Amino acid sequence: MKTKPASVRELAVYPIRTVAQLTGVDARRIRSWETQHGLLRPARTQGGHRLFSQRDVDTILRIKRLVDEEGVQLQGVRLLLAAEEAGESFEDRVMAFPPRG
């Protein structure tokens, strides 16, 4: 049985230091979003180092925008990402959350 080749966007190639530079999000915050909030699932090297795909980078930028610009709490972000994975409209869901005041 042939496996479908990963698209370029799904190849895990960026170490966390590079992702932090690309996104402007501190590496500690990225780790927290993964380990404490379950928002990210980066690949790991055999040595346990995180490797992120372009899709992961896009997700981090999306999380950053939602939290920092839209005022969505991380629990809401988790629900929005789950909705997107289920095929629901991500942007429509954002509008359903009132901004924090």
Task: For every predicted segment, state its role.
Residues 26-29, 73:
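Short coil turns linking two alpha-helices in DNA-binding domains
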Residues 2-21, 35, 41-46, 54-101:
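Arg/Lys-rich, alpha-helical DNA-contact motif
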